[in-house]
Amino acid sequence: MELILGSQSSARANLLKEHGIKFEQKALYFDEESLKTTDPREFVYLACKGKLEKAKELLANNCVIVVADSVVSVGNRMQRKAKNKQEALEFLKRQNGNEIEVLTCSALISPVLEWLDLSVFRARLKAFDPSEIEKYLESGLWQESTGCVRLEDFHKPYIKSSSKNLSVGLGLNVESLLGVLKLGAKLSSL
């Protein structure tokens, strides 16, 4: 059965590739601006649910669809994608030397199964090097990432300690997803 990743995220696509999961990537448009909550957990759950509802429209094709959404929380203050360089700098200042949480809501829908998971990746960060912040802001890479968090490169050397579920921090709970895909395959064969 065909698997569709309903996300434009290159980090999510890379996670699936690294785990040998074949998929087709399609954008699902859901207006996150319509969500009025400022609570990070509620926001990421509602955004993922909204994407899941959009995914249901594609289910006539007898496929498996995976969607996800992530936000960053610093002291329970939500950080989404920065709108400009100034907001990106403010996000990084708040993260500097503090604990960050990447909240990821991952979901799957298929003709035989529906699954939703809300997980948290926590990282305690060291202080950022000011010259590296400037280089990072100039690179523009922050524009692709929620809360400007890039655990795979910019943030990586600053992680003092973290939880073990890195895939959640990168935007998709792949470990749980693999189990759900196996379960879905068993259910389909019944």
Swiss-Prot record:
It is found in: Cytoplasm. Coiled coil: none annotated. GO terms for molecular function: nucleoside triphosphate diphosphatase activity. The keyword Cytoplasm applies. GO terms for cellular component: cytoplasm. Its EC number is 3.6.1.9. It holds the Pfam family Maf. Its main location: cytoplasm. It catalyses: a ribonucleoside 5'-triphosphate + H2O = a ribonucleoside 5'-phosphate + diphosphate + H(+); a 2'-deoxyribonucleoside 5'-triphosphate + H2O = a 2'-deoxyribonucleoside 5'-phosphate + diphosphate + H(+). InterPro entries: ITPase-like_fam, Maf-like. Its cofactor is a divalent metal cation. GO terms for biological process: nucleotide metabolic process. Keywords: Cytoplasm, Hydrolase, Nucleotide metabolism. It comes from the Bacteria. The active site is at D69 (proton acceptor). Nucleoside triphosphate pyrophosphatase. May have a dual role in cell division arrest and in preventing the incorporation of modified nucleotides into cellular nucleic acids. HAMAP family: Maf. PANTHER family: BIFUNCTIONAL DTTP/UTP PYROPHOSPHATASE/METHYLTRANSFERASE PROTEIN-RELATED, BIFUNCTIONAL DTTP_UTP PYROPHOSPHATASE_METHYLTRANSFERASE PROTEIN-RELATED. NCBIfam families: maf (TIGR00172), PRK04056.1 (NF003141). Belongs to the Maf family. This is Nucleoside triphosphate pyrophosphatase.
